[in-house]
Amino acid sequence: MPGSLKEETALLLEDYFQHRAGGAALPPSATAAELRRAAAELERRERPFFRSCAPLARAEPREAAALLRKVAAQLETDGGLNWGRLLALVVFAGTLAAALAESACEEGPSRLAAALTAYLAEEQGEWMEEHGGWDGFCRFFGRHGSQPADQNSTLSNAIMAAAGFGIAGLAFLLVVR
């Protein structure tokens, strides 16, 4: 396991972005598997919105990291960070990274990963540590003993309750861009 929040965040985002770009590798950790699972659920529930974000990366590939930073700042002003908003931000970044990979912009996904790692581990590191780091993420979205059907329903409800304002903030920022 990585020694710091920044290292763990970088590894998780690198894995998730590779996964979103079509990499078939198994997740390297239980945390990576939980991130993939929770992200897939949010993306499935908000598919039209996230699909509408992909062209933004293709239109201005060198500006994708700056756009990600703007969205992160907007989420912060719309009520602060929570696990649902963090997940929405990761899925948004993963959408941009996958679009950049499809466009053969080789450095784009790594720039996004670096920008999001810096935001989560440095700018929001205190919040993440106070909320248990990535273990806290897994506890929030995790499966702790519930039945699979209940689990998916609980996960969906938790994501949408926590990320609701985050999705609205993303949509607003993209409209006024």
Swiss-Prot record:
**Gene Ontology molecular function:** BH domain binding
One biological process term from GO is: regulation of apoptotic process
Spell out the PROSITE patterns in the cross-references. BCL2_FAMILY (PS50062), BH1 (PS01080), BH2 (PS01258)
- The short motif BH1 is annotated over 75-94
Question: Where is the short sequence motif BH2 located?
Answer: 126-141
Entry's Gene Ontology cellular component terms? mitochondrial outer membrane; plasma membrane
Protein family according to the UniProt entry: Belongs to the Bcl-2 family.
Can you say what this protein is called? Anti-apoptotic protein NR13
| Organism of provenance | Coturnix japonica
